[in-house]
Every structure is written in C-alpha cells, then in structure tokens.
C-alpha cells in the first residue's frame, strides 16, 4: 500500500525521444567517433533539460544500415538514459526502413496522461540507398498523429555533404544541426 505522500505525488511529465542512427559503411572511422561523441553530448543536454523540468525521459534508439534494429527500448518499452557506444559500421544506408520502424512507436508514444511533444532525432552522413522510399517514410511520419503534426523532428548531419532528406525530415530549417556543433541545440525549443 502506498504511503500518504505517494498517493498525492504529481506524476512526472514523460518526454518521448527516439533516435534513428546511421551505422552504415560510410560511417566507419572518424564519423563513428563523431556519432558516439554526439550521442554522449546529447545525452547530457537531454538529461539536464529533464532534471530542470522534473521530466521523465522515455528514450528509444534504432540503429540502421542495410537493416534497422532496436538498440535501446523497442516498440513497447523505453529507457530513461541514453547509454550506447557504436564500434562497427557496415552495410548500406536504408533510412526509409528505419523511419518506418520509428513510426511504429508513435501510437504508443503518448500512453502517459502528461507528456511533452515527442522528439525524433535522425543522425546520418549520406543520402539513403532509396531516396524515394525515405521521402515517403518522412511523409508518413508527418501524418503519424493524424492531422496534427505534434512530432518534433530534429536532423543531425555528420560530415559536409548536403543531404536533402534531412531538410525534408526536420520539422523546420532551424532543427538541422551538424554533430560537431551541438552547442546550438541548447537554444532550440525541444521542450515545446
């Protein structure tokens, strides 16, 4: 039986966050180092924001190359901490499949009565192997919550290649960041 104080404790606000991370062959070497560094920095930023706002992080992470797979959480469950390290990069860049896997969580994302706008991070360094499939998956994400696009989509670019898919993915142009300059992400309104 809960004690008296637990009965009246206000539940924390949940903040659903999903990462879709490219580990294809083009990410080998220095780019994988940049990816790991960026995920560590993002973890610190998100945990700081959550602590300040008495927020419970609900984190999922999908790794993709030729196929997409869950690394943290899955369609049914989340983690409260982003703690991953990637050591291998191989295969092709199948972004569309990964985005569809992330979309499969969208109807489960907001089970809690109190939640912040879900955030979906896409981290990649190149165009996918099937751009049309990726653009279609992006359009499906934009409709994941019906007529209201409440999903905040943040694009993180590794390298200097212009990637039109990231422009189409991001909710707005100021939500496209280079992973070696994540300091600017602190100024983005992720807690909307």
Region locations from a protein language model:
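C-terminal "exit" segments of structured domains
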Residues: 178-192
């Amino acid at each position: 039986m809960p004690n008296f104080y637990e009965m009246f404790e206000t539940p924390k606000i949940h903040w659903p966050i999903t990462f879709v991370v490219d580990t294809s062959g083009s990410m080998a070497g220095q780019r994988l180092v940049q990816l790991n560094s960026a995920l560590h920095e993002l973890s610190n930023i998100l945990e700081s924001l959550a602590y300040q706002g008495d927020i419970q992080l609900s984190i999922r992470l999908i790794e993709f190359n030729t196929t997409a797979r869950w690394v943290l959480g899955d369609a049914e469950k989340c983690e409260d901490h982003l703690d991953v390290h990637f050591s291998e990069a191989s295969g092709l860049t199948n972004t569309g499949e990964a985005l569809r896997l992330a979309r499969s969580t969208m109807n489960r994302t907001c089970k809690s009565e109190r939640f912040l706008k879900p955030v979906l991070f896409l981290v990649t360094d190149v165009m996918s192997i099937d751009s049309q499939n990726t653009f279609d998956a992006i359009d499906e994400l934009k409709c994941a919550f019906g007529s209201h696009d409440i999903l905040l989509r943040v694009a993180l670019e590794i390298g200097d290649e212009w990637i039109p898919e990231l422009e189409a993915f991001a909710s707005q142009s100021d939500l496209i960041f280079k992973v070696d300059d994540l300091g600017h992400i602190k100024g983005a309104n992720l807690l909307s």
